[in-house]
């Protein structure tokens, strides 16, 4: 799972 803000 990759989260980019």
From Swiss-Prot:
Naming one, the record's GO cellular component terms include: extracellular region
GO-annotated biological processes = defense response
Domain of life (superkingdom): Eukaryota
| Histidine amide PTM positions | 5
The UniProt keywords, alphabetically, are: Amidation, Amphibian defense peptide, Secreted
Tissue spec. comment: Expressed by the skin glands.
Q: What residue range is the signal peptide? A: none
List where in the cell it is found: Secreted
Major subcellular location class: secreted
The name this protein goes by in its record:
Electrin-4
Tell me the lineage of the source organism.
Eukaryota, Metazoa, Chordata, Craniata, Vertebrata
């Amino acid at each position: 799972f990759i989260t980019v803000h």
